[in-house]
Each structure stands twice: as structure tokens, then as C-alpha cells.
Amino acid sequence: MSDMRLIVAGAGGRMGRTLIHALHEADGAALVGALEAPGSELLGQDSGLLAGLGPNGIPVSADLWSLSKDADGIIDFTVPAATIANVAIAAERGIVHVIGTTGLSASDNAVIKSVTSRAIVVQSGNMSLGVNLLAALVKQVAKSLDEDFDIEILEMHHRAKIDAPSGTAYLLGQAAADGRGVPLEEKSVRSRDGFTGARGRGDIGFATLRGGTVTGEHSVIFAGPYERIELTHRAEDRMIFARGAVKAACWARGRKPGLYSMADVLGLGSQS
């Protein structure tokens, strides 16, 4: 089979540049388009030079419709508004859409789900093998321990991250809620300030830290009577997310239309 031809959305961002590197090194996949927002000062620049590689002859463009004419898929780590705009075009073109964008609202996710009857979408708050294995472990531990064990999720990222809690924190929270058989939206506690009263039994708490250049750290804490279990993942390089996203795109090629997760890609079974 020929290389999968991929577009990188948000080509000038941290993840976009890392994805261009990943595709430069990848077997079975190749970069054919680099997408940025209309009006970006990066438009027209060589995407290889932008990523710190040599020139690759692929200029940054704002026209996804034209780029997608000769592509098999798009990898999208952007912002919610851009991702939702890209969803419609990717579905119309019939190309795979890998979504790593975080901070999506319930209505955004509804839009994404609405196209999956005719489009192939892989969506995850985290594309790394380690985090998705962690989510599977969290689900199992939450299922095994009753509400005598309180669940808290602690995450830390670099100072420039604009959404909180992280998409990975939500993924882990969902895994914990699934293990307990409860709706996350009813049990999640995302802020504590002032006189909050005692912790609610069965709550799933989230705590957020921001600072420095931290790529990503997540811990899920099960705090029980006189003992505590902590499951932790530390990301040391964004390349783990980029390689996971490329793997997801290649895996999705030729699949039936639908909404898939990294658990599907990695053969871990459904986490929902």
C-alpha cells in the first residue's frame, strides 16, 4: 500500500511542528499539506523550514478544501473553532480526521459525532500509548475499589496551555467514572475554593497546575482508609503524541465510518 498522505492542521504550533518532524521520520505516511488559520503570518512559508527541517516544498496554506483534494487524512491539534470547521471539510472530502484538539464543548463533540455516520474520525484527549494504558488501568482500579477510595486527578502542563483541566485529565476522569459506573458530569469536581464543606462521597476531583515547560504530567490518586494508590504518567517529549497520531491515522485508513478512540487503535477495547 502506498504511503498515507496526511495534512497537518495548526502546522505552526508546538504540536504541528512536532507532527511535521514525525512524518519526516515515519514509514508508511507522508506530509502532503500544512494548514494554518487565514491571516496567519506563516502562510506561504515552507513547512519543513518552519519545523526546523530542511525545505520540503510544502508551503503553509489556509485552504483545506484544496489541500484535501490529494490527501488521505488530516491530523488536527488546533483549537475548537478550527477543528469544527475542519470536520465538515474532512467529512465532505471523505478523508480520515484524527482529532487531538482539547477544550471541546459538548456541542462541539455533538458536531463531530454527527458526521461519523459517513466519516472516519479518531478522537482522543491523548494519543500516547502510555496514557491510554493508564486509562485502562484507572478504569480497572476504579471498578475494583468502592467509594471508600476517593478519586483525585492531578495534572500539570507548561505555562502556555490555554485550557484546563487537560483533555488527558478528562480522559482519565472518564475512565474512572466508567469503572465506577457513574456519569462523570454528575461526579466531577473541578474547583475548590473557600469553605467547600466535606468532600462528597464518590466525587471525582480535578486539580490543575500550570508552569514552566512541562510537557504533561498526570496522576490519578485513589485515597482510601489508611492507604493510597497513585498511578502516574509523565510525558517527556511531544513526539509521543505525534507518533501516536500518525499511527492512528494509518490505522483508520480504510475503516468503516465511525467515531474511534486511541483505545480502538491500540486494541485496548472501549474505555466508555
Curated annotation (Swiss-Prot):
Keywords: Amino-acid biosynthesis, Cytoplasm, Diaminopimelate biosynthesis, Lysine biosynthesis, NAD, NADP, Oxidoreductase. InterPro entries: DapB_C, DapB_N, DapB_N_CS, DHDPR_bac, NAD(P)-bd_dom_sf. It holds the Pfam family DapB_C. GO terms for cellular component: cytosol. Pathway: Amino-acid biosynthesis; L-lysine biosynthesis via DAP pathway; (S)-tetrahydrodipicolinate from L-aspartate: step 4/4. Catalyzes the conversion of 4-hydroxy-tetrahydrodipicolinate (HTPA) to tetrahydrodipicolinate. This is 4-hydroxy-tetrahydrodipicolinate reductase. It comes from Afipia carboxidovorans (strain ATCC 49405 / DSM 1227 / KCTC 32145 / OM5) (Oligotropha carboxidovorans). The lineage of its organism: Bacteria, Pseudomonadati, Pseudomonadota, Alphaproteobacteria, Hyphomicrobiales.
